[in-house]
Amino acid sequence: MKIGIDGSKISRRRILKYGLAVVGGATLGFPFIRTAHAQSPVKIRYATGGGIGPNEMETVIYLDWMQKNVLKQYGKAYTVDMTFTRGTPEAATLLAAGQADMATLSFAVFATSILKDVVPGGMKIVADNYQDGHKGYAANTFFVLQDSPVKTVSDLRGKRIGINAYGSAVDLALRVRLKMDGIDPRKDVQIVEIAFPNIGPAIREKRIDCGVLILPFMNNEVQKGGLKAVFNGGDAFGPYSVIFHVATNNFLKANREAVRAFLSDYVLGLKWFYDPANRKRAIEITSEFTKSPANVLDQYFMTERDYYRDRDGCVSAEVIQRPVDGMQREGLIDKPVKIADYMDLSLLPGLCKA
């Protein structure tokens, strides 16, 4: 078990109730009456990638209130048993161990998992989650204190840098960007693991010199002032898909219609959140879940100050291939991975452009 710089342990938490640490999911679905002609809904064991809404939208789309008021097939075709992980590497571990059927993975963890063939039967990318590096939208950004002598990436040599988990998307973006400036991430800096919510405090308390901030924590910390940006993920890869939804091939083979229903509700929920008519309630339930003040969320959530998301859940192979190629170019993986061979977007409710 890894322990981060903040002393927190990487642990697995099952959903028990509505709240920050846990989300109403499988135990709070609609009652289902078994009949001779009906089947129980398929339970989907889902592992998150370490973020919460409004970072990972699945964490808010399948909340209890959404199940009862928005989602059409929850409790009928499927239910969700959601495990909150510290990062995408842990989510991949659960897939490999047969303890999760679907998950949010980063491009980095996905490519590594494919090359190592860690998931029995393999897996497919079935929908996008969010993308980084799109002009005019939020980007995962590495910050230092305002009065820090660090002004450019080259100034990070010899510094201590915080990321959420080794092998995560932000970790790979960091390593690629450092190498672009001739800095060896294994020798010239110290990279440490810190849970996303604790990175901002770690920077301010000078336990690290630099750290990555993602939404919603980035917006909260920027509002406090005293920080300055050094670089973001787009500087390493250009526009790219940071995280996406995957399903194991074994689960897809046995429960294809359940995954189709899950994704149909995901897109329905995503569009519900983006609908201006629902904004007040969307902010309320997200605030209740994340414990972020509603007035703070209202400043960026589901606006151009938020991440870029395809509202149909579509993602092109290109925006995943680009950072994966960067990994090979920088020696972080030793073989190419053709992403298009590991995609199945046919279960989404709409048609995606090739």
Question: What is the meaning of each model-derived region?
Answer:
Residues 324-354:
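Conserved C-terminal helix/tail region of periplasmic/extracytoplasmic solute-binding proteins
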